[in-house]
């Protein structure tokens, strides 16, 4: 056996459970977040494991036993890969529901996890539904907290929230389409939150299904070593079961809904393929696991248990993903995935969770999942229920009891836990207490998404979730006079969803809502109509432009106002310059020598800078990547005050901005279009018409995927054009990439339009 096979590259995994992208970072021109930086930035999983092992020493046998039974699992995938159908089968086989219902509500019931009418009609998952269920494996009972997440790009925040509090995930991939654009996005999110995953290749009963092509794509596109632990028995419509490669046994689903598992000998015609794929599994594991590598070099045949242990180690180390296969709709191959969740994904004691000690200069603290420790929990999702605000909480340390008082670390407010529930989609079951590692929900707690709660004895804060900036806005006006329901709905949606923003434009007297895409905003307008009986008229979708500068400009501005009695006086001198590092956002600095401007006036200058950046001088959009330095100035003994310096700063900024070769920046989107091969020419023509830059083309045997970069301003109405060009068979996804300067003629048009609007006022 060739020793060269073992020349693998050492793993460089991002350590820690908390994302290595700092949450205060500006993402491709997004505005800064007032979130904590990442509490953990370790370079290797090995270092992380040392800390996890140290923490395990502090756990009692009861804690270890309780954690061993727990799995916090998310289900993520590209839209229409069959996540919700898969979850429906999981709930049925774990006896949480008594009958299977299909997505899109075809049987007038709809999938259990799609609890909103809108979800059942559109056949897409909008919110992450949380539920828990039990699974028996080899005589032991395991408790799963299960979260079904949306696959549509516009609902990315729901996926982010789910992954932030989970310990592992099932990545569902379509056997026909393979790795798609949103699969790549979900993979990036899993890496950001260091979530290990088991992969399930779904829709094996569909024509054109090819699981091994999908596995190749996992390796090449997602850059994660992946190998099959099963192969299918039969293909497409003749799919009848799977072969377990590790145990060399065939698994069949019998009964009306596949609830009975039968094991038998492997069909003779599949034995050569089974041995080939089993060997490939061992070789792939040898590349990522040291113990398996030694056995491989010594040419020893690993036992079944040794293979399972190697898969578990490398999956938890996030250096490998085992691949299972089946069809949720055909009730085939789901129970082995539940066994794989138990066998290969971590329990809460095997994951490092870190907080910041606010009382000790934000020092990092490793949380211990023991019930005797002080309580620490994260509110990761809010919902408005019929009994008031429902807050989803992940307990990281200690226990949460009904009737206990808990403290919001951010606000310092103490609140009583009046009711504690476990969620089953939109239904709930009351419980008296939950221990560390569990996910629960509570009522009557006023907080924001991402707030940390403790029992008051410690002041720990969890790092918050990364929130992408909104890229599409539209004006919205209620038809009815029911203003109270309109504002109630907007307030609720904002609290529930950090990517949904609302502002009132005093000039146009319109309410502007902003979000992640057209569908995102459409869903909220529709929810307003259904849940609050508020019909709205919406304007045309608007692009969220940004304004910036390209060269430095000095300023020396004096603000004077005399109106009898005390007047106003403030003078500021300095420089306005572009920020080269887009991760820093807008920067305000002072370098005043000798106290020529007192600190309280400088603070007012800072406020003026923040305010003027919200509405740029060119077209009234937010300013991006600009640094303002005030290094001199003057005050008047009587007339100077905070307002004078705030006004002087704002006027100086506007004046210097217009002299610094300003540019208007527009959002550039990553576009992925998938369509049958016969429409390839039409789709390329359509993208060329939009002046898109085509980056990559992938041709499958019956469909192709085009990846391109395109200005968002040209993409409105693209769904309709694509439907027309592909006879309704094409699909696409959009994701924000970066901001780039608009073409000079577009900039001229935008400025001219803005000036006309201003002149009318």
UniProtKB/Swiss-Prot annotation:
Residues 68-349 form the tr-type G domain. SUPFAM superfamilies: EF-G C-terminal domain-like, P-loop containing nucleoside triphosphate hydrolases, Ribosomal protein S5 domain 2-like, Translation proteins. The keyword Transit peptide applies. Mitochondrial GTPase that catalyzes the GTP-dependent ribosomal translocation step during translation elongation. During this step, the ribosome changes from the pre-translocational (PRE) to the post-translocational (POST) state as the newly formed A-site-bound peptidyl-tRNA and P-site-bound deacylated tRNA move to the P and E sites, respectively. Catalyzes the coordinated movement of the two tRNA molecules, the mRNA and conformational changes in the ribosome. It comes from Saccharomyces cerevisiae (strain ATCC 204508 / S288c) (Baker's yeast). One of its GO terms (cellular component) is cytosol. Residues 1-42 form a transit peptide. The gene is MEF1. This is Elongation factor G, mitochondrial. Keywords: Elongation factor, GTP-binding, Mitochondrion, Nucleotide-binding, Protein biosynthesis, Transit peptide. GO terms for molecular function: GTP binding; GTPase activity; translation elongation factor activity. Pathway: Protein biosynthesis; polypeptide chain elongation. Present with 6348 molecules/cell in log phase SD medium. NCBIfam families: EF-G, PRK12740.1-5, small_GTP. GTP binds at residues 77-84, 148-152, 202-205. The precursor is processed in two steps involving mitochondrial intermediate peptidase (MIP) and mitochondrial processing peptidase (MPP).
